[in-house]
Amino acid sequence: MDKLVIEGGVSLNGPIRVSGSKNAALPILLACILPEGPICLSNVPRLRDIHTTLKLLDILGCETSFDGNTVCSEVKDLKIEAPYDLVKTMRASVLCLGPLLALKGEAKVALPGGCAIGARPVDLHLTAFEQMGATFDLDSGYIHGKCDKLKGAHINFDFPTVGGTENVLMAAAIAEGETIIENAAREPEVVDLAKFLIACGAKISGHGTSIITIQGVPSLKGCDYKIMPDRIEAGTYMVAAAMTDGELLIQDCPFQELESVVYKLRKMGVSLEEEEGGVRVRRANGLISGVDITTQPYPGFPTDMQAQLMTLMCLSNGAGTIEEKIFENRFMHVQELVRMGANIKLKGRTAMIRGVEKMTGAPVMASDLRASASLVVAGLAAHGRTDVQRIYHLDRGYEKLEDKLSAVGARVWREQE
């Protein structure tokens, strides 16, 4: 098993390019089931979850290729079953449910590993499809759905679920009649999926707002499409620049989609300026201030940037709080940061952070994707050596991270444990 070794205390300086968004690429890849004819997607990040999704597409009857950062896919003989050995490693694979029901009238998709219905919003997906005419059985860990022909419906989500919105968006594109999604997720990745479907011939309006309207069409056609840049990767580099008191020019930065993060970083004393070629990030006056943050669905502050901002607050001149309102158990990184010298107290879903003068390198263990990113950022600024274990989490969401960081001055490399 690999670990990441970081010799901290070095400022990061220079240009750093943001890869394509994994969270946009995954639903768009699964939407490749829908159109007739070939599809070419560019700016696709080379990540483990992407490779898993391509395996799933192959099993479902697509012909796929992955050359550089371009994926080409075409449906040849569509099957209806997504097996457990693939789905267990990646929750996003439940997004093939909508396209399969819409095209084949039947889908058999394994429940993601450890995911009981009700514990995560898989039930929101199923309730929506039931409104569109599908019926479901839960059989030996599989969701087995059937329908004659999905029909448009008025769907009002209890919570603006990203996956639920994406699943219904795909199915409704070729369902019979009009579908209206109220309390729809507004995330940029949902908007990117809608733009892809529109490029394939779908009739969608309202994407990016809380009410999306879809007029079903008989069929979709293939197209060429470029995946949006990864806003969370870009946000992570913003924090890394401020954390190490360096200056980064972040290229291919989706600046408008990071408005809530940029607002908080500026309040903390970080300068972020758009210019030709990217966004230049550095400390405004040398000091970092604490702020109060509450995670919310988009356009609120993203839960996926919570751990990184907490890490920056650890070196602030003052104190701040973070209230996590999206996920439970999203503070797994706190004890690891404390091992590096951070002053953090937890009370329920709120973390109270008081800044310290310096952090010290230590062996730490990543518990999830964003926690691992926060530990890498902490290691970049810490005095001495930090070993980040379990970086397979990191490999799920960051393309060539150590190569990109090394190119802007970081002393970071991969070792086998």
From Swiss-Prot:
> What Enzyme Commission number does this protein have?
2.5.1.7
* Catalytic residues in the record: C115
Q: What class of enzyme is it?
A: transferase
Q: What is catalyzed by this enzyme?
A: phosphoenolpyruvate + UDP-N-acetyl-alpha-D-glucosamine = UDP-N-acetyl-3-O-(1-carboxyvinyl)-alpha-D-glucosamine + phosphate
A Gene Ontology BP annotation from the UniProt entry = regulation of cell shape
What Pfam families does UniProt report for this protein, alphabetically? EPSP_synthase
- Report the residues modified as 2-(S-cysteinyl)pyruvic acid O-phosphothioketal: C115
Q: Please give the start and end residues of each transmembrane region.
A: none
Q: List the subcellular locations.
A: Cytoplasm
InterPro entries assigned to the protein according to its UniProt record, in alphabetical order: Enolpyruvate_Tfrase_dom (IPR001986), Enolpyruvate_Tfrase_sf (IPR036968), MurA_subfamily (IPR050068), RNA3'P_cycl/enolpyr_Trfase_a/b (IPR013792), UDP_GlcNAc_COvinyl_MurA (IPR005750)
Kindly list the positions annotated as binding UDP-N-acetyl-alpha-D-glucosamine.
Answer: R91, R120, P121, V122, D123, L124, D304, I326
Q: Name one GO cellular component term.
A: cytoplasm
* Residues annotated to bind phosphoenolpyruvate: K22, N23
Q: In which pathway does it act?
A: Cell wall biogenesis; peptidoglycan biosynthesis
Superkingdom of the organism of origin: Bacteria
This chain's function reads:
Cell wall formation. Adds enolpyruvyl to UDP-N-acetylglucosamine.
Q: What is this protein called?
A: UDP-N-acetylglucosamine 1-carboxyvinyltransferase
Organism of derivation: Maridesulfovibrio salexigens (strain ATCC 14822 / DSM 2638 / NCIMB 8403 / VKM B-1763)
Taxon lineage: Bacteria, Pseudomonadati, Thermodesulfobacteriota, Desulfovibrionia, Desulfovibrionales
